[in-house]
Amino acid sequence: MDLHRAAFKMENSSYLPNPLASPALMVLASTAEASRDASIPCQQPRPFGVPVSVDKDVHIPFTNGSYTFASMYHRQGGVPGTFANRDFPPSLLHLHPQFAPPNLDCTPISMLNHSGVGAFRPFASTEDRESYQSAFTPAKRLKNCHDTESPHLRFSDADGKEYDFGTQLPSSSPGSLKVDDTGKKIFAVSGLISDREASSSPEDRNDRCKKKAAALFDSQAPICPICQVLLRPSELQEHMEQELEQLAQLPSSKNSLLKDAMAPGTPKSLLLSASIKREGESPTASPHSSATDDLHHSDRYQTFLRVRANRQTRLNARIGKMKRRKQDEGQREGSCMAEDDAVDIEHENNNRFEEYEWCGQKRIRATTLLEGGFRGSGFIMCSGKENPDSDADLDVDGDDTLEYGKPQYTEADVIPCTGEEPGEAKEREALRGAVLNGGPPSTRITPEFSKWASDEMPSTSNGESSKQEAMQKTCKNSDIEKITEDSAVTTFEALKARVRELERQLSRGDRYKCLICMDSYSMPLTSIQCWHVHCEECWLRTLGAKKLCPQCNTITAPGDLRRIYL
């Protein structure tokens, strides 16, 4: 297309100032004058088209009217003063066969303006015509006309000055390869490169022309539409096979993911959701993006499916329980109906109501008059089946000897409390003597070793306390009171003993304290009824006032106390 466009520009430029100077008029004139004189052959030069690169704009030094064919051709000396003896490439003088018959006379072409700026000139003599080669023979390539390394076209004028057409590009870039191939094909089509490439067989020439024409119309380097990579013509087949292999691997990878998800034991809900997701995928999405999205959302989607499967499992379990309950109720109703039918049949056979005697008189039971008997009255009848555990003996005494060992404390070990009134004290002593059956009281705790300064009862959870709580003393000051105030040395020793005791308590940490005396345990006891732990004296004084635990008010006997070791 560029060749025709260049030729069109040359026809309408200053080379042909006369509008009649066109190839069509030239043919008409030459055919009209062919019958006059056919002795002188003539070659008709075609309009000169400058080969121009496809992608690059180059500088053309002869686009104005000052340059004529005479300034570019060599060895033309027939016209004195206008053309000098110059050599020029004969490939520029290619003629079409229909325009140059062998017996054509070129003398009438003088009507097409033979001035110094015309594009068509007659040859002066026979030597000039014979000095040129035929336009249909392979042309010889001049020196510096075509370089294999750089596709540049050079011409020289009469002064020996060379003109370079084309731009030099780096040979390593794709653009240079494209320009090289395109320029080479353009020059070959226009006849500028006409050595062994032009001197081939007709079949090779036809194939080469097809390839060159395709290259002229599609001169851009191919680009992969998938990965947008610039490719060379030799890499097209290999790259296409690589893309096809990647495309074939995508369905297999997707099927493997689905097979992993559809492992044995997968619930139906998971299979259904996977199929819905597979159907809902966009058909226009690319395989790469779909695979990336599946991998990106696989974790969250698996979590969603697991939660939904667990929820459906719970719902199915509830439904199964409800069905079992309904079946059990149906069986019970069936058995009840069978019993009712049996009773009705029996009553119908007997044709009498239930009778009983009361005070020597026979009476009819009123419930038998109701339809359905006692069950029809709305009361619930209990089954006659007895529980097999109902015959077990009930242990009222609570013999825990085998489990907890023999009792360690008795009623004689209890420390009785003294009331404010003498009458209450006498009653307590009488009751205690009756319980002991005249036995002597225990001497486990003597008043001198008692932690309590008086016989007042400690406070319990019921709020019962003595009015002299301010006078109560704990084990912290009991040792000091035992010592007489007359001896200063004894007091000093007692203080040192107290300090050592406090140091031991600090070293132990005193993590365990009695909740009654608020001191560390002297002899801890626990009850097998409530398992609360208190000091021995605290337990015995509390049980002397009431048979209840001082912490939780659980009924506790002296025989329930057991010694423990912390």
Curated annotation (Swiss-Prot):
Zinc finger (RING-type): 514-553
Keywords: Cardiomyopathy, Coiled coil, Cytoplasm, Deafness, Disease variant, Isopeptide bond, Leukodystrophy, Metal-binding, Nucleus, Phosphoprotein, Transferase, Ubl conjugation, Ubl conjugation pathway, Zinc, Zinc-finger
Taxonomic classification: Eukaryota, Metazoa, Chordata, Craniata, Vertebrata
Disease: Leukodystrophy, hypomyelinating, 23, with ataxia, deafness, liver dysfunction, and dilated cardiomyopathy: An autosomal recessive neurodegenerative disorder with systemic manifestations. Affected individuals show delayed motor development and ataxic gait in early childhood that progresses to spastic paraplegia with loss of ambulation in the first decades of life. Additional features include progressive sensorineural hearing loss, hepatic dysfunction, and dilated cardiomyopathy. Death occurs in the first or second decades.
Effect of R363Q: In HLD23; shows decreased beta-catenin binding
Catalytic activity: S-ubiquitinyl-[E2 ubiquitin-conjugating enzyme]-L-cysteine + [acceptor protein]-L-lysine = [E2 ubiquitin-conjugating enzyme]-L-cysteine + N(6)-ubiquitinyl-[acceptor protein]-L-lysine
Protein name: E3 ubiquitin-protein ligase RNF220
A GO biological-process term: positive regulation of DNA-binding transcription factor activity
EC number per UniProt: 2.3.2.27
Coiled-coil regions listed in the entry: 485-513
Crosslink feature (Glycyl lysine isopeptide (Lys-Gly) (interchain with G-Cter in SUMO2)) location: K277
GO annotation, cellular component aspect: cytoplasm; glutamatergic synapse; nuclear lamina; nucleoplasm; nucleus; postsynapse; protein-containing complex
Post-translational modification remark: Auto-ubiquitinated; leads to proteasomal degradation.
Disulfide bridge positions per record: none
Record has Transcription as a keyword: no
Tissue: Ubiquitously expressed. Abundant in brain and spinal cord, particularly in the cerebellum and cerebral cortex. In fetal tissues expressed in the cerebellum, spinal cord and cortex.
Pathway recorded for this protein: Protein modification; protein ubiquitination
Pfam families noted in UniProt: RNF220, zf-C3HC4_2
Taxonomy, superkingdom: Eukaryota
Assembly behavior: Interacts with SIN3B. Interacts with CTNNB1 (via Armadillo repeats 2-8). Interacts with USP7 (via MATH domain).
